[in-house]
Amino acid sequence: MSMTPKTPILDTVNSPADLKNLPLDRLKSLADEVRAETIDAVSVTGGHLGAGLGVVELTTALHHVFDTPTDTLIWDVGHQCYPHKILTGRRDRIRTLRQPGGLSGFTKRSESEYDPFGAAHASTSISAALGFAVGRDLKDENRNVIAVIGDGSMSAGMAYEAMNNAGHIGGRLIVILNDNDMSIAPPVGAMSHYFARLVSSQRYRSIRKLGKGVAKALRVEEAARRAEEYMRGMAMGGTLFEEMGFRYVGPIDGHDLDQLVPVLRNVRDGDNGPVLIHVVTQKGKGYAPAEASDDKYHGVAKFNVITGEQQKSKAAAPSYTKVFAQQLIREAEADSRVVGVTAAMPGGTGLDLFGERFPDRMFDVGIAEQHAVTFAAGLAADGMKPFAAIYSTFLQRGYDQVVHDVAIQKLPVRFAIDRAGLVGADGATHAGSFDIGYLGALPGMVLMAAADELELSRMVKTAALIDDGPSAFRYPRGNGTGIEIPDQIEPLEIGKGRIVREGSRIAILSLGTRLEESLKAADALAAQGFSTTVADARFAKPLDEDLILRLAREHEVLITVEEGAVGGFGAFVLHMLADKGALDRGLRIRTLTLPDVFQDQEAPFDMYETAGLNARHIAAKALEAMGKDDAAAERVAAALIAG
């Protein structure tokens, strides 16, 4: 249920220029209207809600004080950018967020001049902003560069690498630390209030205890001075940033425009050099359901604004993520060496369920994929059985560690690659397109792709038994097929696929969940008189050479199908067939992959339709290879639609 809010001030805002002369009282009212508009828009489209609501006042203040787009404003991750989009001329399209042909759910350079740098992954903003700042100085220009980064993103080493470099360069750069988890310090109105709360805190008492120990070794006066400096630095959060060459300002209340606006003006008009402003905010601010449960309202489906109830359809089958978690729990019950590692995505990867059962064996390392991989490598080297559950798109961030710390040392880290393939509304930045190619290139890697929930369970079991090197299994976002999973799961034979359907003229070799579409294509082809074999490869590495050579030998046409980019499974098959001389007799072979483009957001089925990987495309490709005309393909397509 959505009731369009009344927004008289926002109705007059077409660009940030319209905010410049607003007095503070009207600026506060504008922020309230932006918050109401954000809530209403996301209730219609779904998307990231809590983070955006937490930065409404900050966004309003930034566009009031700074001269965007002349001043460069970069949002880390970008999922909090909905208020920013509303204020930068995109309000008329805000209810197309994450829809086909609509606004991206993140910042996007091609969408607006107010998005100077795109994002969707964490911790990139300071590096990018420093690049803009250095470019500005080399061109002798006079403009501000601002990066807004959340405290969660500060858990990634890249943010500190950028700050270290920025402090060394010493140029003018403004970094705003949006502390929405209160992980560094609480908001303050006055220092006296702050220290009143501080001295009653466990943190202060721990530091005071430490101070007593120090006093035994130092003169009382010197000990007191050093303890005070240490306490203030730890509590206020500024010492680390100042040591890196930043002037530290804060913490300040990120929802109080009376504080935000003058501080931003002072920093804007202040001295050169890097500055960090520590702003404390609350996720979901101003919307009671989101304030009460910020984790459930981080990313939401369409919802009723009045009740907060999300409109989630009841699943007919469990999600692949849940199936993975349940099987991992079974493995951990049988083997105390099984542990789970995730990089700030316990809920998304299912490791929250594992952690409920085994709290001492689940490790959330924060937004730190590089560390996650090498941490898992260390666990493996010490005899544990780590499962690193990471989204395909985020595993890219730790690829050097996969190569250097895992593969070269032949350490048995098991990579559970969630969100493999196309993911829908989050678009290109979150697609799991490349892992088959970049993992399949590594010597000794065992790489599997699940066709359904039972196959995924068997792959978890198989990975748990691999102790002589790394392994990985990939599976998509969303629900499974509904296949029954028995209590006793049998492992797979390494490098062996399976024949799912026997035929004689055309062979379709599927890797992953395109198996269902491949079977539909085979039915349609058979109805037109083309007997079709369907095989599930299971393994992208090592390949089942015997199976593939048999398919090549006994059929006129061989089609490979995968939910991955060019240079993946199909390329591996072609390389093997060429090496074995199987192409010499004139086999007609085609590889169906994701297209060589970055696809924008659509519903998952529609994304695969655009990609040409649904049943009608598979059948059409087979008919093309058989030399049949378009009319035959049209008949098959019509049969599939009718079916």
UniProtKB/Swiss-Prot annotation:
Keywords, in A-Z order: Isoprene biosynthesis, Magnesium, Metal-binding, Thiamine biosynthesis, Thiamine pyrophosphate, Transferase
InterPro entries listed in its UniProt record: Dxylulose-5-P_synthase, THDP-binding, Transketo_C/PFOR_II, Transketolase-like_Pyr-bd, Transketolase_BS, Transketolase_C, Transketolase_CS
Binding-site residues, thiamine diphosphate: H79, A120, H121, A122, G152, S153, N180, Y287, E369
Coiled-coil spans in chain: none
UniProt pathway annotation: Metabolic intermediate biosynthesis; 1-deoxy-D-xylulose 5-phosphate biosynthesis; 1-deoxy-D-xylulose 5-phosphate from D-glyceraldehyde 3-phosphate and pyruvate: step 1/1
Tree of life domain: Bacteria
Disulfide bonds: none
Record-level Gene Ontology MF annotations: 1-deoxy-D-xylulose-5-phosphate synthase activity; magnesium ion binding; thiamine pyrophosphate binding
Name of the featured protein: 1-deoxy-D-xylulose-5-phosphate synthase
Organism whose genome encodes this protein: Maricaulis maris (strain MCS10)
Taxon lineage: Bacteria, Pseudomonadati, Pseudomonadota, Alphaproteobacteria, Maricaulales
Name of the gene: dxs
